[in-house]
Amino acid sequence: MKIVLLDAKTLDNDKRLDSLKDLGEFISYDSTPSELVYERCKDADIIVTNKVVFDAPLLKQLPKLKLIAITATGTNIIDLEAAKELNIAVKNVAGYSTKSVAQHTLTMALILLSQIPYYDAYCKSGAWARSDIFTHLSGGLGQMEGKKWGIIGMGEIGREVARIASCMGAEVSYTSISGNIQNLPYTHLPLEDLLKQSDIISIHSPLTPQTHNLINETNLPLLKKDALLINSGRGGIVNEEALAKHLKEGRIYFGADVLEVEPMKEGHVFLDTSLHARLLLTPHIAWAYENSRKVLIDKVIANIKEFLQS
């Protein structure tokens, strides 16, 4: 049984993955460019990957392949119809990062509300040491209590964000792009109304034809002045060029853990330093807090063991 891990670096080369050696011949690669995928997979019985794409033509060239174990929730990297026709099982891991992504979302909102980067830079610049008073309030300080928090996408993560935000005194509402209006203790609003009314908006939807470019040059002007927009869902939901224009005009704040193209490309509009006072970026890490990553890896290993035993 040959098991090939194609992108161990996406899991920080976690040593827990070494237990796959107990299940067969195990080969691990830090990353795998598209031109090397076939060569590395042609003799594999099981492939473990996070981001490597397997389309129908590639799958048809891998007659030994029995299982693709995805180290993530999304299965969009696999042509699922082709895999089914070829009798290749596909297993993912759902729900492992709910707490992690919710924590990251709240962290981003609190950092922006409290203007932490401004005050941190103020202190480290030596300005506080030169001050004639004990405090400095010029950066502004927003408080969560009483804020209206709008959630786009009320799945497990959206509900966890709603729970925590409510505990901090925010008034939560949500919109459902899929039309799935749930029996929840929060007000459901159409998207336009949510954008108009919310002080903080967080995105937790998957990227679908319905959600692609959902937040764009047409509806961004609906946001309140100085509203916070947080995207910890998927890149591509927010039109980045349009968003940058509103940042440059000083209208809103934006926090993002995901971008349409990852890693971020050189020359990206968000690298414009004139935007940075209203922009907070992290490199797609919300899913990967310590406990969540452990749950993910344990479940990937369990998925492979269950498959081998079936």
Regions found by a protein language model. Give the residues of each.
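Short beta->alpha connector loops at strand-helix junctions that form conserved
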Residues: 30, 71-72, 88-99
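Rossmann-like dinucleotide-binding domain for NAD(H)/NADP(H)
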Residues: 226-228, 232-310
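Rossmann-like dinucleotide/phosphate-binding beta-alpha-beta segment
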Residues: 135-225
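Phosphate-binding beta-alpha-beta segment of Rossmann-like dinucleotide-binding domains, i.e.
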Residues: 86, 94-148
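An anion/phosphate-binding loop that grips the pyrophosphate of nucleotide cofactors and donors
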Residues: 44, 62, 197-198, 226
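Rossmann-fold NAD(P) dinucleotide-binding segment
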Residues: 53-65, 210-229
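N-terminal glycine-/charge-rich "phosphate-binding" loop or analogous flexible N-terminal tail
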Residues: 1-44
